[in-house]
UniProtKB/Swiss-Prot annotation:
GO terms for biological process: ribosome biogenesis. GTP 2 binds at residues 182-189, 229-233, 294-297. The lineage of its organism: Bacteria, Bacillati, Bacillota, Bacilli, Bacillales. It comes from Bacillus licheniformis (strain ATCC 14580 / DSM 13 / JCM 2505 / CCUG 7422 / NBRC 12200 / NCIMB 9375 / NCTC 10341 / NRRL NRS-1264 / Gibson 46). This is GTPase Der. The gene is der. Residues 4-167, 176-351 form the EngA-type G domain.
Length: 436
């Protein structure tokens, strides 16, 4: 078994995300005074008194026939199944409500340990109200204040009491982290679901359904992966709501946290300028990149369509000429099987080291094929090259004068290195340095 799992559940707007962020120690779950802001399961690692555990925030459970409410309830139920301990969050200002009683009925059926938290008890006078919560049937209620951070220690003490029989293990460093980025409604969530076969992320045809960066852990070919499914990035001019702003920042953070970035395009709508801007973030961050053309099932096509679309991709994304282009459909799952091998290859190449002697043979052969440039009568001299870093692979070429290294010749050397070693899916960087 892995680390203990703690799920926070409750009706909407009782402060689940605020408490989640308090315990996790960073702003992972988006917080607003609007019911329904958290709609998926949000994961984070946390620690209390030397106990490492995984924490899950969930959407507010509401009773109703609307499909979206049913989806959120289903997400919360999955979180409860995963959990070893459940924090049942209520609102001390509003007292016990009918909605709380409905959540309690669901919790009874789980037969999991439940710790009852009464949030928004912001001053001592409000403590008198918490006794009503005994009626929910989960023993002693713990008064807390997410706004002020009060009472969390007692709550976490009670939660960690249930960890005693759960062995702790930590995730290994070899875990590959990758994310899917793209503008809203290109099918990122659907791709995640198609890949891992579980309704991990709420899928809806409303653009912007996934508001938070949501980590999903899974194993593929005996290797561990973490996939970060990010909120769709909108054009800056359309980022009106504060929530949307947080989501864009979170998506950029997800790129920073990832080793491989899958840039998802809409095969039906084609390529727009925003797609290039989004892909540019990943390239500039030095991440490995895989280009995914989704919704290919919806495209009218003949034997030339795929080749023509790939040519458009290459034309629009000239800076990503190293990235493979995959065509697939999350809806029909056609060619979904090509995504993980491409991610694995990109990850391996992103971390690849080459032997210095072979590298220098390649460089010298390149110089013999295409002599170095001259400027004002001075010719560039290349003495030797070495690899100085990975993620991305980075090379330093020692020369007589770095100013003589024209970008076109640097590009030529990059192409020769790629011809020799591959490096599909990853940028490589070359820097000229004066030999001392």
């Amino acid at each position: 078994m892995g680390k203990p799992v703690v799920a926070i559940v409750g009706r909407p707007n009782v402060g689940k995300s605020t408490i989640f962020n308090r315990i996790a120690g960073e702003r992972i779950s988006i917080v607003e005074d609007t019911p329904g802001v958290t709609r998926d399961r949000i994961y984070s690692s946390a620690e209390w008194l030397n106990h490492d555990f995984n924490l899950i925030d969930t959407g507010g459970i509401e009773v109703g026939d609307e499909p979206f409410l049913a989806q959120i309830r289903h997400q919360a139920e999955i979180a409860m199944e995963e959990a070893d301990v459940i924090i049942f969050m209520t609102n001390g200002r509003e007292g016990v409500t009918a909605a709380d009683e409905e959540v309690a009925k669901i919790l009874y059926r789980t037969k999991k340990p439940v710790v009852l938290a009464v949030n928004k008890v912001d001053n001592p006078e409000m403590r008198a109200n918490i006794y009503d919560f005994y009626a929910l049937g989960f023993g002693e209620p713990f008064p807390i204040s997410g706004t002020h951070g009060l009472g969390l220690g007692d709550l976490l003490d009670a939660v960690s009491e249930h960890f005693k029989n759960i062995p702790e293990t930590k995730y290994e460093d070899e875990v590959v982290q990758f994310c899917l980025i793209g503008r809203p409604n290109v099918g990122k969530s659907s791709l995640v679901n198609a890949m891992i076969g579980e309704e991990r992320v709420i899928v809806s045809n409303i653009a912007g359904t996934t508001r938070d960066a949501i980590d999903t852990r899974f194993t593929y070919n005996q290797r561990d992966f973490v996939i970060v499914d990010t909120a769709g990035m909108r054009k800056k001019g359309k980022v009106y709501e504060a929530t949307e702003k947080y989501s864009v920042l979170r998506a950029l953070k997800a790129i920073d946290r990832s080793e491989v970035v899958c840039v998802v395009l809409d095969g039906e709508e084609g390529i727009i300028e925003q797609d290039k801007r989004i892909a540019g973030y990943a390239h500039e961050a030095g991440k490995a990149v895989v280009i995914v053309v989704n919704k290919w099932d919806a495209v009218e096509k003949d034997e030339r369509t795929m080749k023509e679309f790939e040519e458009k991709v290459r034309d629009h994304f000239q800076f990503l000429d190293y990235a493979p282009v995959l065509f697939m459909s999350a809806l029909t799952k056609k060619r979904i099987h090509t995504l993980m091998p491409a991610v694995m290859t990109a990850s391996e190449n992103h971390s690849m080291r080459v032997q210095t002697n072979i590298l220098n043979d390649i460089i010298m052969d390149a110089v013999a094929m295409n002599p170095t440039p001259t400027h004002n009568g001075n010719r560039l001299k290349i003495y030797y090259a070495t690899q100085v870093a990975v993620k991305p692979p980075t090379f330093v070429v020692f020369v007589n004068d770095p100013e003589l290294m024209h970008f076109s010749y640097e590009r030529f050397l990059e192409n020769r290195i790629r011809d020799a070693f591959g490096f599909e899916g990853t940028p490589i960087r070359i820097f000229a340095r004066a030999r001392k």
